[in-house]
């Protein structure tokens, strides 16, 4: 019964039923399990996968990638729109594309293209490099390749070549200069690719990316620029080549009302252009389908106040309503949502290496007549504190502490005395917080004290590499321990990474009602790794991660699960080693080895080191090129000499 209650408490604390979208749950053993097909009928314990990694000496941190979640999420996306089209008897069609920038990892795109083929799923690119990579994939014959972003001549020439390859290319115009080059190039080669116009809507998105939309957006054509573009296309005799109207009101749209406003406006733009004799076929609604990171289903920036089906229903209904009122045939709807497709399929796993203790053991502190009077007074405060005087006595302890530290700074107090003071102050704070909790009164001073005293869990990863959005824009990701969920978590803590940067600390966590300043965690056991999972990290994080402190891309396991819930296949992808990271920064292996060799040679000539030691160090140095930059599971000191 206790285990069951602890599991129920864990479900409530970590909110997995809210943000898991059917892909994650907690087993009766108190472990996190994955449901790759979106239901509980098929499940695999994440600890089993980590056992596989341990047996093969695959170090944490690592990403667990589940292509079947990607496949399921793609099916959900297309089903939502198809269901809406059936319900409203929509006469147009659907074409979804994946924005390359959301996750450019080859392993991910490989799985995406394979899963997307049955949906005629396409790709969206925004740069020459992305287009170059995307063209190497053979997509479904009906799949679109939408080319956004600012373009130079080489970008445009490559797009024209793609049309010769049989690709359904649409070049979306960001400015009239781009359009003029396309028109000129089309004259030279004797054909034109499909053209799209990106509209700068008045309607805005919501959430963290609201500023990327509206009339102040850096992207899209104003109404005046739109009219100029239409005139240029008509003058060039390319009216039949204008195929798409495109807009985008930002990533992670949190409010469905904003979606509706934009849909109405964009549908009007589409209809007006169509009625002017242009051969429009596609209305590209951009991306922005929100991911409910905190499980609250609200308009909070880490959530979304609508479901995928509601989003699709509103889009289809409003496009049809506007087109009917304009006597315009309904277009093929194009969706570029990538976050909602990619986020769920990847889990970052790492292990806790250390928990920082606050203070020491009060039982080990001995205060006698030989100690400074302030130390004796402080111990007296600790011993005499009660529920009636805890506020006053706590204030006294702070005053004593400040006086003692001032004396230390002036050289009148020993380091041992300072250490005793720290232990006593720590225990006084604990005692005061205990009485404050019993009082039922909420004093701001003690609420802040409680926040400041959360434990610090040192985890073996880099925030800047693996979840950079949590640092750069304070994006929230679900975080929870992967085991021991049938035990009560006795501590609250923040998570520190192993970079030498004070910003490498995670102190904001998801909660259905608010944002938590700490996370419920267990005391790690010395003989068992304590693994923590960071969920919904499959969108943008790998693309935006940086090599701060020379921590690079982490190890990966690509996991396939059988319909019976067995581990069917696990593919290993090695993370970046030290040598690869240094080469990115323009170091060469030869240059580094030469630097070591020259210094060791000088030491050898000076008689400070033996040839055997030189040889041993050089052998050690060569091995470092293939070293994983993160902390090893068990480190063994190698003795030189």
Where are these regions (language model features)?
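Short helix/loop capping segments that flank catalytic or ligand/cofactor-binding pockets
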Residues: 106-108, 133-134, 156, 181-182, ...
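Generic beta-strand/beta-sheet core signal
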Residues: 99, 126, 148, 174, ...
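Active-site-proximal beta-alpha core segment in soluble small-molecule metabolic enzymes
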Residues: 89-284, 291, 305-310, 318, ...
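Short glycine/threonine-rich loop-to-helix capping motif typified by GTGT followed
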Residues: 253-261, 292-310, 340-354
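Conserved, well-structured core domains of diverse proteins
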Residues: 1-59, 560, 568, 579-581, ...
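Charged (often Lys/Glu-rich) extended helix/loop segments that serve as interaction or gating elements
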Residues: 314, 320-641
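Low-complexity, highly charged intrinsically disordered N-terminal segments
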Residues: 27-104
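Short, glycine-/Ser/Thr-/acidic-enriched flexible segments
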Residues: 31, 39, 69, 103-105, ...
């Amino acid at each position: 019964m206790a285990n069951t209650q602890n599991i129920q408490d864990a479900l409530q604390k970590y909110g997995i039923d809210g943000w898991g979208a059917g892909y994650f749950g907690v087993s009766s053993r108190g472990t996190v399990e994955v449901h790759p097909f979106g239901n509980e009928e098929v499940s695999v314990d994440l600890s089993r996968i980590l056992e596989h990694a341990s047996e093969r000496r695959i170090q944490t941190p690592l990403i667990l990638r589940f292509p079947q979640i990607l496949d399921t999420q793609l099916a959900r996306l297309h089903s939502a729109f198809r269901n809406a089209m059936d319900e409203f008897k929509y006469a147009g069609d659907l074409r979804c594309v994946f924005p390359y920038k959301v996750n450019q990892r080859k392993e991910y795109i490989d799985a995406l293209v394979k899963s997307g083929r049955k949906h005629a799923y396409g790709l969206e690119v925004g740069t020459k490099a992305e287009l170059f990579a995307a063209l190497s994939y053979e997509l479904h014959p009906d799949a679109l390749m939408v080319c956004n972003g600012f373009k130079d001549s080489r970008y445009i020439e490559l797009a024209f070549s793609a049309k010769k390859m049989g690709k359904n290319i649409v070049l979306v115009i960001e400015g009239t200069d781009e359009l003029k080059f396309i028109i000129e190039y089309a004259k030279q080669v004797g054909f034109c690719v499909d053209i799209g116009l990106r509209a700068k809507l008045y309607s805005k998105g919501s959430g963290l990316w609201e500023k990327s939309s509206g009339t102040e957006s850096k992207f899209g054509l104003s109404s005046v620029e739109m009219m100029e573009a239409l005139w240029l296309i008509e003058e060039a005799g390319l009216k039949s080549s204008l195929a798409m109207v495109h807009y985008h009101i930002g990533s992670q749209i949190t409010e469905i009302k904003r979606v509706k406003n934009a849909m109405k406006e964009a549908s009007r733009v589409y209809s007006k252009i169509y009625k002017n004799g242009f051969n429009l076929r596609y209305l590209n609604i951009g991306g922005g389908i929100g991911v409910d990171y905190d499980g609250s289903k609200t308009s909070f920036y880490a959530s979304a106040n609508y479901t995928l089906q509601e989003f699709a229903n509103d889009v289809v209904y409003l496009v049809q309503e506007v087109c009917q009122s304009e006597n315009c045939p309904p277009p093929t709807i194009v969706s570029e949502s990538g976050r909602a497709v990619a986020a769920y399929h990847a889990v970052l796993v790492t292990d806790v290496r250390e928990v920082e203790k606050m203070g020491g053991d009060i039982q080990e502190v001995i205060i006698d007549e030989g100690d400074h009077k302030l130390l004796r007074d402080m111990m007296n405060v600790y011993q005499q504190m009660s529920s009636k005087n805890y506020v006053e006595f706590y204030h006294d302890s702070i005053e004593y502490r400040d006086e003692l530290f001032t004396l230390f700074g002036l050289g009148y107090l020993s380091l041992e005395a300072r250490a005793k003071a720290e232990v006593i102050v720590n225990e006084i704070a604990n005692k005061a917080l205990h009485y404050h909790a019993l009082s039922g009164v909420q004093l701001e001073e003690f609420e802040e004290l409680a926040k400041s005293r959360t434990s610090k869990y040192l985890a073996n990863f880099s925030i800047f590499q693996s979840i950079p959005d949590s640092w750069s824009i304070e994006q929230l990701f679900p975080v929870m321990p992967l085991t021991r969920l049938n035990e009560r978590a006795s501590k609250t803590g923040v998570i520190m990474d192993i970079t030498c940067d004070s910003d490498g600390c995670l102190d904001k966590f998801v909660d259905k009602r608010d944002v938590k300043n700490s996370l419920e965690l267990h005391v790690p056991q010395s003989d068992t790794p304590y693994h923590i999972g960071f969920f919904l990290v499959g969108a943008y994080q790998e693309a935006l991660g940086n090599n701060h402190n020379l921590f690079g891309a982490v190890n990966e396991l690509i996991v396939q699960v059988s319909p019976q819930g067995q581990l069917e296949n696990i593919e290993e992808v090695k993370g970046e080693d030290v040598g690869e990271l240094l080469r990115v920064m323009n170091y060469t292996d030869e240059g580094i080895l030469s630097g070591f060799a020259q210094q060791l040679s000088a030491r050898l000539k000076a008689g400070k080191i033996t040839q055997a030691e030189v040889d041993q160090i050089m052998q050690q140095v060569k091995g470092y090129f293939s070293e994983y930059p993160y902390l090893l599971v068990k480190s063994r000191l190698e003795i030189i000499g």
